[in-house]
């Protein structure tokens, strides 16, 4: 997947608008997420490994908030010949267009249905795997429980839900420590103080992370019997829940 360098916040902007997954972001997204999210490549690769283990023949897989299709591609490579369908859903037309190009670059017998839609409007059915890869944190908090419930109801017994998120920590000392570690990670990847500050301002009204306890409670209350964090680096984590 080709990507330009992320310089969206490299110059002083008089008025910072809320972050959007628009054409500008879609064009630099791979570079942006690689330099901003520690462990992203490992998360993507392991999502494919989970697919190999959990996806059952003739079932559906849902990548909710699919962006450029990295998770979908990782899954598709692992489930050839199983007669499954993947539903890759994103509400950004710019992301869907680039995802279409990325998927077309690889031959596969697995059908991918690309949908430009709100993930809250998608019917989940016959699902052996659902992925929410840095997606839930952008939904209004009051909509998150209902989405998890609908996912659970549409999953097959033994199905897996993978949720990757930035985390909020109830302990202020830990929150500050891991925030600082993440900022150092971004600096080490070439982001300036101006870029870091302006992007933080753009995100503050649209991204609201939950704590690990909130995630676990939400999953348990909506029926999932098994839950674990399988990956964490600083304030970013990926979790699995099994029906």
Swiss-Prot record:
Keywords: S-adenosyl-L-methionine, Transferase. It comes from the Bacteria. InterPro entries: CmoA, Methyltransf_25, SAM-dependent_MTases_sf. S-adenosyl-L-methionine binds at residues 40, 65-67, 90-91, 118-119, 133, 200. Gene3D superfamilies: Vaccinia Virus protein VP39. It holds the Pfam family Methyltransf_25. It is an enzyme of class 2 (transferase). It catalyses: prephenate + S-adenosyl-L-methionine = carboxy-S-adenosyl-L-methionine + 3-phenylpyruvate + H2O. One of its GO terms (biological process) is tRNA wobble uridine modification. GO terms for molecular function: carboxyl- or carbamoyltransferase activity; S-adenosyl-L-methionine binding. Its EC number is 2.1.3.-. Belongs to the class I-like SAM-binding methyltransferase superfamily. Cx-SAM synthase family. Homodimer. Catalyzes the conversion of S-adenosyl-L-methionine (SAM) to carboxy-S-adenosyl-L-methionine (Cx-SAM). This is Carboxy-S-adenosyl-L-methionine synthase. The gene is cmoA.
């Amino acid at each position: 997947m080709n990507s330009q360098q992320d310089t969206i916040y490299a110059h002083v902007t008089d008025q910072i608008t809320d972050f959007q997954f628009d054409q500008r972001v879609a064009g630099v997204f791979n570079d942006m997420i690689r330099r901003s999210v520690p462990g992203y490549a490992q998360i993507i690769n392991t999502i494919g490994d989970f697919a190999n283990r959990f996806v059952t023949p003739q079932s559906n897989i849902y990548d909710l908030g699919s962006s450029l299709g990295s998770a979908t591609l990782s899954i598709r490579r692992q489930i050839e010949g199983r007669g499954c369908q993947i539903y890759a859903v994103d509400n950004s037309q710019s992301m869907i267009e680039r995802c279409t190009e990325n998927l077309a670059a690889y031959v596969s017998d697995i059908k991918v249905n690309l949908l430009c839609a709100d993930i809250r409007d998608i019917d989940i059915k016959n699902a052996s795997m659902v992925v929410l890869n840095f997606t839930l944190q952008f939904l209004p908090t009051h909509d998150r429980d209902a989405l998890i419930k609908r996912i659970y109801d549409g999953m097959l017994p033994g199905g897996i839900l993978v949720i990757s998120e930035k985390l909020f920590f109830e302990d202020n000392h830990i929150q500050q420590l891991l925030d600082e570690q993440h900022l150092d990670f971004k600096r080490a990847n070439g982001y300036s103080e101006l870029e870091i500050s302006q992007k933080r301002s753009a995100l503050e009204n649209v991204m609201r992370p939950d704590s690990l306890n909130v995630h676990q409670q939400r999953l348990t209350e909506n029926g999932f019997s098994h839950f674990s964090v399988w990956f964490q680096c600083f304030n970013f984590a990926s979790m699995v829940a099994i029906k």
